[in-house]
């Protein structure tokens, strides 16, 4: 897998993983990059991506059990949670920065998820001038109203994120998107090939393509780049990040010094602000 000390083995009810310092589901769920990692009363979580869902429960020694076949874990959930990347190596490269050392201590279990591009486009359009509970509620309503039922876990029904075709021409008012509704409707008019081609573009071209779309500015484009295309050099800047750069670095911070994982640095910084 990676240079980190990782335990990954089959157990009777799924796959046990243990990554001691760089994988914490609560930190990931609270990080603001995903809105469908659902906490359960037993301390577990349900993750959903595309047409797959999995229950994840606490395992031994701080690990987690993925309740799914090993092949599904390998093909779906390892990529989704970016488990093959060496986040410990990323952290070691930040060790010379006192602020980032503190950020690692506070939120070193975060990983940058490899999420569905289309879902991220809609989600981060919804996120504009919004807070996490409202974003989560709007996304849940879209899934429950227009998505495909995927199954029930612990008495709760889970749904896929609706495809462009499932949203096209629909009344989205139940999700209370406000002015963002027209942007989402416009996105749904693009055919699947548009999003496929976007994934093939280099970073600069993809960012320009996204910013050219109505309803997507620079910050949303960079969020989509990071969370929907896994372009790890993307460094989304909002008012909080800009304030941190001013306060901690006196306005002088160049994300390119962390080439290949600048987006991870951004996520850690947000946790510590």
Task: Label the model's feature ranges.
Residues 1-271:
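HhH-family (HhH-GPD) DNA N-glycosylase catalytic core used in base-excision repair
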């Amino acid at each position: 897998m990676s240079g980190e000390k990782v335990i990954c083995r089959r157990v009777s009810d799924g796959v046990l993983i243990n990554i001691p310092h760089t994988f914490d589901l609560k930190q990931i769920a609270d990080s603001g990059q995903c809105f469908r990692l659902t906490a359960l009363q037993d301390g577990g979580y349900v993750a959903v991506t595309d047409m797959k869902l999995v229950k994840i429960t606490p395992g031994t020694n701080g690990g987690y059990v993925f309740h799914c076949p090993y092949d599904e874990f390998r093909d779906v959930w390892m990529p989704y949670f970016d488990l093959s990347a060496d986040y410990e190596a990323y952290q070691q490269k930040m060790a010379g920065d006192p602020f980032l050392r503190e950020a690692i201590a506070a939120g070193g279990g975060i990983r940058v998820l490899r999420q569905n591009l289309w879902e991220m486009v809609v989600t981060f359009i919804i996120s504009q001038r919004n807070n996490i509970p409202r974003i989560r509620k709007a996304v849940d309503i879209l899934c429950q109203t227009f998505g495909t039922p995927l199954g029930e876990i612990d008495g709760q029904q889970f749904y896929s994120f609706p495809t462009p075709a499932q949203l096209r021409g629909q009344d989205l008012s139940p999700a209370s998107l406000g002015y963002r509704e027209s942007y989402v409707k416009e996105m749904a008019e693009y055919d699947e090939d548009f999003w496929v081609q976007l994934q093939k573009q280099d970073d600069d071209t993809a960012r320009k393509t996204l910013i050219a779309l109505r309803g997507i500015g620079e910050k949303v484009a960079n969020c989509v780049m990071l969370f929907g295309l896994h372009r790890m050099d993307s460094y989304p800047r909002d008012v909080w990040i800009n304030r941190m750069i001013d306060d901690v670095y006196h306005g002088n911070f160049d994300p390119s010094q962390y080439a290949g994982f600048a987006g991870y640095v951004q996520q850690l910084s947000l946790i510590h602000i």
